[in-house]
Amino acid sequence: MDFENLFSKPPNPALGKTATDSDERIDDEIDTEVEETQEEKIKLECEQIPKKFRHSAISPKSSLHRKSRSKDYDVYSDNDICSQESEDNFAKELQQYIQAREMANAAQPEESTKKEGVKDTPQAAKQKNKNLKAGHKNGKQKKMKRKWPGPGNKGSNALLRNSGSQEEDGKPKEKQQHLSQAFINQHTVERKGKQICKYFLERKCIKGDQCKFDHDAEIEKKKEMCKFYVQGYCTRGENCLYLHNEYPCKFYHTGTKCYQGEYCKFSHAPLTPETQELLAKVLDTEKKSCK
């Protein structure tokens, strides 16, 4: 029976294949379900992450996938060729940059030297003009010196030399020896056979001991009353050229009463010929003013 059944109902030759196919389909369905569940989990995690960090975050699955791909392609990659080409290009660009930089640095000092030369030209011209002027002045001075050679010089230098030689010899100074007579008459006054400095007599001589004229004289006051003394603020005091308390009091000497008494600013002393003349002048001026 069994043998007949085999010929009448032969076994299905594809039965083994279908069984294996069904098993594989079941395994694929399980894998897809697992992958879908993993993808859903990843989506949920991404939704929970803020927007700022979503793009930066990388799933571990994708990173593993990338690593595997990089390992697979490392053997067949062309990185070595690309890197060599990029290095060659970089070296060429670097050489070009260095050459351009050197050219620019070489051009800058030339321009600066040109500018400095342009700036220095007016200064150099000014300096030349100054040197020419100085040389011209020196030439004039030399000519002036040549005009008056010898010991017979007429001028301030000669006077100083002669006075210095006299002082060394111990002789008395002769200040007026080398001065013209017109100059002496203009600036002096004769007193007792001496030429006295008229500015000294007026108390206006500034030179003092260095004055060329004599100061050996008594200063006589002018026979006039000091108007500042009458007003009460003459600052010169005893050095004033005008009369102060020497002037005669017209009230006392005319017989009228002087109300100032001892405190009078003018003199109550007996009249002298000089003071009598002064009193007469005062009385004459008053009579003329009354008329």
From Swiss-Prot:
Residues 168-177 have a biased composition (Basic and acidic residues). Residues 154-165 have a biased composition (Polar residues). This is Zinc finger CCCH domain-containing protein 8. A zinc finger (C3H1-type) spans 191-218, 220-247, 248-271. Residues 127-148 have a biased composition (Basic residues). The modification Phosphoserine is found at S22, S59, S63, S77, S83. The gene is ZC3H8. The keyword Transcription applies. GO terms for biological process: apoptotic process; negative regulation of DNA-templated transcription; negative regulation of T cell differentiation in thymus; positive regulation of thymocyte apoptotic process; positive regulation of transcription by RNA polymerase III; response to antibiotic; snRNA transcription by RNA polymerase II; snRNA transcription by RNA polymerase III. GO terms for molecular function: DNA-binding transcription repressor activity, RNA polymerase II-specific; RNA binding; RNA polymerase II intronic transcription regulatory region sequence-specific DNA binding; zinc ion binding.
